[in-house]
Amino acid sequence: MGLTLTQKILSAKVGREVKPGELIEVDVDMVLGNDVTAPVAIKEFEKIGIDRVFDNTKIALVPDHFVPNKDIKSAEQVNIMRKFAKKHGIVNFFEVGQMGIEHALLPEKGLVLPGDVVIGADSHTCTYGALTCFSTGVGSTDMAAAMATGKAWFKVPEAIKFVLKGNLQKWVSGKDVILYIIGKIGVDGALYKSMEFTGNIKALSMDDRFTIANMAIEAGAKNGIFDFDEITEAYVKGRAKREYKVFERDVDAEYSEVYEISLDEIRPQVAFPHLPENTRNIDEVGKVKIDQVVIGSCTNGRISDMEIAYKILKGKKVHPDVRLLIFPATQEIYLECVKRGYIEEFIKAGAAVSTPTCGPCLGGHMGILAKGERALATTNRNFVGRMGHPESEVYLSSPAVAAASAIAGYIVSPEEV
């Protein structure tokens, strides 16, 4: 049998064909850490007792979870990163003012490219598979080892193929597609497998693909990965500062399962507490009142997400009982929002607009929920206590549903505002 897209990339790194279940060691093209995970990795790295990192251009340190520093502990965490970056001449350390949410920032800067093998000490490192690379999350100890050796080990995953057909309806986006898929297969439906997306992927923008790959981990996947096409090429062109290699799956590649997804049939989705698999069509949600709406995160903080929110919010007001928080994912996206007039309209509508940060997504800061409060968010997880008090609730949706709901005061379709 032939090789899947993930097998093709890993085989090229190993220098021979690899099979699912094999344990392999490969050279990595990028090692990533943030202000939660990198300080732990740095301490482990220093225990190894070597003088330098394997390559100061292939490590990215991005403080994004608790920045701008929310307290003394978070300030100390970032300072560990800052000192390490200076000591080892880490080229890709992003200080406050340059940083963004890591999984939006690295593709934007051209630091992850097609054909790469990327590891990050953050579970949503799988985002970069939208660019036809193998990327996956690891622990801080694996990050430390990779910073020292430039290598990582994996068990080669089996793969599931998702064949996309048709086109998206109005107000339906990549977020709705991935919530629909997770609702279909469950949070363990792709456990330690590669989710490979093919078919009519031209129906999806690059931002849609980032969103879908980002949430592959919410189905338990090792990685999510898209075919390379002209949309991928257009995104990478002008960003890539080094050569990259495009891989294609074999026509006779073996998959553990194959799903056909009819994009035409997908309506806006909402994931109910407390798992991303608890999805319902917007028409089946009912009148769920909300206290807070969050638009942003590594899942939905890109310029197209901001544009959708702008189109819905323009000339309208946020419901008086709702707090609307908007987080452009990077400084570049924030600046583009300013240039296009989005920020002005957000503020006129009654939203609070923040510098890039993960903020409330992980219950960090800038939008923590109190007991009994309910939020609708464009983030990727809605576990118990994820955004604050254990007795609060988080619902997940697209930016379109989130913006419309902020106006209505309850979860609603964009068609209704």
UniProtKB/Swiss-Prot annotation:
Residues annotated for [4Fe-4S] cluster binding in this entry: 298, 358, 361
Subunit and partners: Heterodimer of LeuC and LeuD.
Cofactor note: Binds 1 [4Fe-4S] cluster per subunit.
This enzyme's EC code(s): 4.2.1.33
Coiled coil: none
GO molecular function, one term: 4 iron, 4 sulfur cluster binding
Protein name: 3-isopropylmalate dehydratase large subunit
One Pfam family matching this protein: Aconitase
Gene: leuC
Enzyme class: lyase
UniProt cross-references to PROSITE patterns, sorted A to Z: ACONITASE_1, ACONITASE_2
SUPFAM superfamilies given in the database record: Aconitase iron-sulfur domain
UniProt KW keywords: 4Fe-4S, Amino-acid biosynthesis, Branched-chain amino acid biosynthesis, Iron, Iron-sulfur, Leucine biosynthesis, Lyase, Metal-binding
